């Protein structure tokens, strides 16, 4: 690796290239690979966080597709502070996207730029320090790279090997590829003006423009996530070190009894000489469990989602509420592991209907019967429950969420 020396002061800006669509990484429905989750967060969040927390970062520009701004903002929410990050919109090729990012970064006045693939999340600050040291020593272009270790073959159009390529002196290029900003901007502008669009990385443009490119040691971990299996393996790697994110939510509800023909508990109608008074069907058990589920992801309570002042919920079956809460949990990345309901009532007797209630909970929540529990007790004729003026319910939900981050 070449060593160069200079005392030129510098400031480093970052261009993260994230405008690609990632056709090789799965179906379009799965979204661009830079926004797929690994270890509970989008790929780009891991990449961005490394630069945000690197002490030498002066400014960051992320180049994205115009359709992805909402995805990026969502990813940024998982990072402690990325408020100073700017967005540029990319073109139809990586080369066009890099040019857009470097043009925007130039306005900030930084002297040097690191250009990095968003889908290389496993670099570290040591790598950035090595690149920065080479820039500080006066190198106009710096390329982190790893010596090629695999045997290389050249083949003809019929897939027949024509030769074994000597690997001595061959390196696999990585990012961030880093430059004096004015030099690489001029090189990109000239390439665009000359309609030269066949470059596979920024170092190749620098070479074409006559800039000497200095190699520094890359990192074996600094792999590019290209295909679907890469993303799955990255997720396995990061998830292995995460604590399980197990959350417990509690809910409580009570409804008054009045003369009637029966009560609905856990979605099961039980004939009785009283009924529960409420805006909906007054299923006190499902109301308590709805609150318990919402509590596991900080999503408020049943009144926030279904206000009793709204006439559309008058007489509504409470399965609407519990299924809505279960969807919210799943949208937040949660898996419902257990639902437990304790009913407190003098009458009617719950025991004969317990299994039907458990079956309803299993149906509403989409979980197995063994994960659903219904219990009942009296209040020993004490208080409003003991006087048969109402029924109370206490519910607990256990949910496991992806990620394990506090």
Swiss-Prot record:
It comes from the Bacteria. Gene3D superfamilies: 2-C-methyl-D-erythritol 2,4-cyclodiphosphate synthase, Spore Coat Polysaccharide Biosynthesis Protein SpsA, Chain A. Residues 1-246 are annotated as: 2-C-methyl-D-erythritol 4-phosphate cytidylyltransferase. This is Bifunctional enzyme IspD/IspF. Its EC number is 2.7.7.60, 4.6.1.12. The keyword Lyase applies. In the N-terminal section; belongs to the IspD/TarI cytidylyltransferase family. IspD subfamily. Its cofactor is a divalent metal cation. One of its GO terms (molecular function) is 2-C-methyl-D-erythritol 4-phosphate cytidylyltransferase activity. The record marks 24, 33, 279, 378 as: Transition state stabilizer. A divalent metal cation binds at residues 253, 255, 287. It catalyses: 2-C-methyl-D-erythritol 4-phosphate + CTP + H(+) = 4-CDP-2-C-methyl-D-erythritol + diphosphate; 4-CDP-2-C-methyl-D-erythritol 2-phosphate = 2-C-methyl-D-erythritol 2,4-cyclic diphosphate + CMP. Keywords: Isoprene biosynthesis, Lyase, Metal-binding, Multifunctional enzyme, Nucleotidyltransferase, Transferase. Pathway: Isoprenoid biosynthesis; isopentenyl diphosphate biosynthesis via DXP pathway; isopentenyl diphosphate from 1-deoxy-D-xylulose 5-phosphate: step 2/6; Isoprenoid biosynthesis; isopentenyl diphosphate biosynthesis via DXP pathway; isopentenyl diphosphate from 1-deoxy-D-xylulose 5-phosphate: step 4/6.
């Amino acid at each position: 690796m070449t060593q160069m020396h200079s005392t030129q002061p510098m400031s480093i800006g970052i261009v993260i290239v994230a405008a690609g669509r990632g056709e090789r990484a799965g179906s379009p429905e799965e979204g661009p690979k830079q926004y797929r989750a690994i270890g509970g967060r989008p790929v780009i969040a891991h990449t961005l966080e490394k630069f945000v927390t690197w002490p030498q970062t002066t400014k960051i520009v992320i180049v994205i597709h115009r359709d992805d701004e909402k995805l990026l903002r969502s990813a940024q929410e998982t990072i402690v502070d990325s408020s100073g990050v700017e967005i540029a919109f990319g073109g139809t090729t990586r080369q066009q996207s890099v040019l857009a990012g470097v043009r925007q970064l130039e306005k900030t006045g930084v002297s040097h730029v690191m250009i990095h693939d968003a889908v290389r999340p496993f670099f570290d600050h040591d790598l950035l320090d090595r690149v920065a040291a080479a820039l500080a020593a006066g190198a106009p272009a710096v390329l982190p790279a790893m010596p090629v270790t695999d045997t290389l073959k050249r083949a003809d159009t019929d897939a027949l090997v024509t030769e074994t390529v000597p690997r001595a002196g061959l390196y696999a290029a990585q990012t961030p590829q880093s430059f004096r900003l004015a030099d690489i901007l001029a090189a990109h502008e000239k390439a665009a003006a000359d309609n030269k669009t066949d470059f596979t990385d920024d170092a190749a443009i620098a070479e074409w423009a006559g800039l000497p490119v200095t190699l520094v040691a890359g990192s074996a971990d600094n792999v590019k996530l290209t295909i679907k299996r890469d993303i799955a393996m990255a997720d396995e790697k990061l998830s292995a070190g995460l604590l399980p994110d197990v959350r417990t939510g509690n809910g409580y509800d009570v409804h008054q009894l009045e003369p009637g023909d029966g009560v609905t508990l856990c979605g099961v109608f039980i004939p009785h000489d009283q009924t529960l008074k409420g805006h909906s069907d007054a299923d006190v058990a499902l109301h308590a469990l709805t609150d318990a589920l919402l509590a596991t992801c900080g999503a408020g309570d049943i009144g926030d989602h279904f206000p009793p002042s709204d006439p559309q919920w008058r007489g509504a079956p409470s399965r609407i509420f519990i299924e809505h809460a279960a969807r919210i949990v799943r949208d937040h990345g949660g898996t419902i592991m257990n639902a437990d309901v304790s009913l407190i009532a003098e009458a009617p007797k719950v025991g004969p209907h317990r299994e039907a209630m458990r079956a309803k909970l299993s149906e509403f929540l989409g979980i197995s019967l063994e994960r659903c529990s219904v219990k009942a007790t009296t209040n020993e004729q004490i208080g409003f429950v003991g006087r048969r003026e109402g029924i109370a319910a206490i519910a607990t939900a256990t949910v496991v969420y992806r990620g394990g981050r506090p």
